[in-house]
UniProtKB/Swiss-Prot annotation:
Name under which the protein is recorded: UDP-N-acetylmuramate--L-alanine ligase
Top EC class for this record: ligase
InterPro entries given in the database record: Mur-like_cat_sf (IPR036565), Mur_ligase_C (IPR004101), Mur_ligase_C_dom_sf (IPR036615), Mur_ligase_cen (IPR013221), Mur_ligase_N (IPR000713), MurCDEF_pg_biosynth (IPR050061), UDP-N-AcMur_Ala_ligase_MurC (IPR005758)
Cross-referenced Pfam families: Mur_ligase, Mur_ligase_C, Mur_ligase_M
EC number(s) per entry: 6.3.2.8
Entry keyword set: ATP-binding, Cell cycle, Cell division, Cell shape, Cell wall biogenesis/degradation, Cytoplasm, Ligase, Nucleotide-binding, Peptidoglycan synthesis
GO CC, one annotated term: cytoplasm
Main function: Cell wall formation.
Source species, domain of life: Bacteria
Molecular function (Gene Ontology), one example: ATP binding
Name of the gene this protein is made from: murC
Catalytic activity, reaction form: UDP-N-acetyl-alpha-D-muramate + L-alanine + ATP = UDP-N-acetyl-alpha-D-muramoyl-L-alanine + ADP + phosphate + H(+)
Provenance organism: Prochlorococcus marinus (strain SARG / CCMP1375 / SS120)
Protein's cellular compartments: Cytoplasm
Length: 472
């Protein structure tokens, strides 16, 4: 590694099992650094880290730091994410011992400087677009390094250390840390107001994106997003699924169903070829086109790209089919923003009452089982949630997943139910008081041939996993 200020350091990750933290830990360990961590959970990422020889403490206790600092002293660096609170006992002990503490974004910024980096940012589609880029480059024999916010099917991991020149990484806008990154290519999928615990309005988010664009040598962005047109510089490389004239890269859909999307592909207004992708939905065409645009901007030949877009797979928890339970198909999805719900339901609707579907059997109804994520997001976007949930045939709401936030008075799933009914008075909608009651409610309110679409960024995925394990 070049420009390496951490060559003799030991990195200790507080909360190492998270999708972002575990990826960084994997890459550092495979590049020869000493790595340890702590996490209260026990998930597949923890097992993968242990397989790499990484020592993981089961509790986030002050004694972890005391034990490590006895051996490492000035060589020990503590890594945290924005999810780690200041009152965390392990972090408090690190401060007490005056240890060097870095945010995960500082580690990623360091890794980005080592390779030709393609950074994916935006409100929605980051993980899917990153996965597609990583898959294309992997299959095109580029052997990239990747740090992704989801499990990439091609590598069956959220991180991979390759021998090629490319590094693919997500640049998280949620806490503004993406302004630390100096990328070779910065890709922007879209931006709209979210993370209202950090951004007061859309203008503050746009200003952060503008800072990010100034740090990247090339910007590749989605022309179909009005906010990106405000945020991006004049020399932006644009892609679009709506128009091809005066656009650098375009894919205009010709056939779209629940099984495939066929589109006419253009470069700089000139028709090149048709492309077929196995990921239904306009948003997935957009994600795929963004990935193609990034690869082409990195001088990958289109002939090395096209053969691989027809067999793409989404990362885990992106419309992930889990199985069939009592005649009901189970799909798990990460959607937790109104726009993500809209796009996912639009995609699901393509699979209702048809055999042209990526699902194994035709479904009659879409049943959304939604776990709102964060009180602040629910409060600030409740009107949009209420509108977009109306595209389902039946809705079941769980309690709000706090993600570490304190409750906000009056912001509950019952409130979201009332707002949704005001927009959609004929929509069957139910709430459950506790997540453990959910299976019983699903059993009572749904029927055979329903598509059970579990949505949310919290622990709702555990319910879909539990039901899938009951499949005989």
């Amino acid at each position: 590694m070049t420009n390496n200020p951490y060559q003799i350091k030991h990195f200790h990750f507080i909360g190492i099992g998270g999708i972002g933290m575990s990826g960084l830990a994997m890459v550092l360990r495979q590049r020869g650094f000493a790595v340890s961590g702590s996490d209260k959970s026990n998930n597949p990422s923890i097992n993968n880290l242990k397989d790499l020889g990484i020592n993981i403490f089961k509790e986030q206790a002050a004694s972890n730091i005391s034990q490590l600092s006895e051996d490492k002293n000035e060589q020990l660096i503590i890594v945290i994410s924005s999810a780690i609170r200041q009152e965390n006992e392990e972090l408090k002990e690190a401060y007490e011992k005056n240890l060097k503490i870095l945010h995960r974004s500082d580690i990623l910024a360091f890794l980005i400087k080592q390779q030709y980096s393609i950074l994916i940012a935006g409100s929605h589609g980051k993980t899917t677009t990153s996965t597609i880029i990583t898959t294309i480059l992997g299959k095109a024999n580029q052997d990239p390094t990747a740090i992704i916010g989801g499990i990439v099917p091609y590598y069956n991991s959220n991180a991979y250390v390759g021998k090629g020149k490319f590094l693919i990484a997500e640049a998280d806008e949620s806490d503004g840390s993406l302004t630390k990154y100096d990328g070779d290519i910065g890709l922007l999928t879209n931006i709209e107001l979210d993370h209202t615990d950090y951004y007061t309005n859309i203008d503050s988010l746009i200003n952060t994106i503008k800072k990010f664009t100034k740090n990247c040598k090339k910007i590749v962005a989605n022309y179909d997003c009005n906010n990106l047109r405000k945020a991006c510089p004049d020399k932006t490389i644009w892609w679009s699924t709506n128009e091809f004239k005066n656009i650098n890269f375009a894919a205009i859909p010709k056939i779209m169903n629940g099984q495939i999307t066929l589109a006419s592909y253009y470069e700089n207004g000139k028709y090149i070829d048709d492309i077929s992708i196995s990921l239904p939905g306009v948003h997935n065409l957009n994600n795929t086109l963004g990935a193609i645009a990034a690869c082409r901007s990195a001088d990958i030949n289109f002939s090395d790209i096209k053969p691989h877009v027809s067999s793409l797979k989404c990362p885990e928890r992106r419309f992930q089919f889990k199985g069939i339970w009592k005649g009901r198909q189970i799909v798990d999805d990460y959607a937790h923003h109104p726009s993500e719900i809209r796009e996912t339901l639009s995609m699901a609707r393509l699979m209702i009452n048809t055999k042209k579907s990526i699902l194994p059997m035709a479904a009659d109804r879409i049943v959304v089982i939604f776990q709102p994520h964060r009180y602040s997001r629910t409060r600030d976007l409740i009107t949009e949630f209420a509108k977009n949930l109306g595209a389902a045939d039946l809705v079941i709401l769980t309690p709000i997943y706090s993600a570490g936030e304190e409750p906000i008075k009056g912001i509950t799933s019952e409130k979201l139910k009332s707002c949704t009914l005001a927009n959609n008075p004929n929509l069957p909608i139910f709430t459950c008081k506790q997540l453990r009651d959910l299976e019983n409610i699903i059993n009572l309110k749904t029927r055979e041939n329903d598509l059970l679409l579990f949505m949310g960024a919290g622990d709702i995925t555990k319910v879909s996993e539990k039901l899938s394990k009951k499949i005989k």
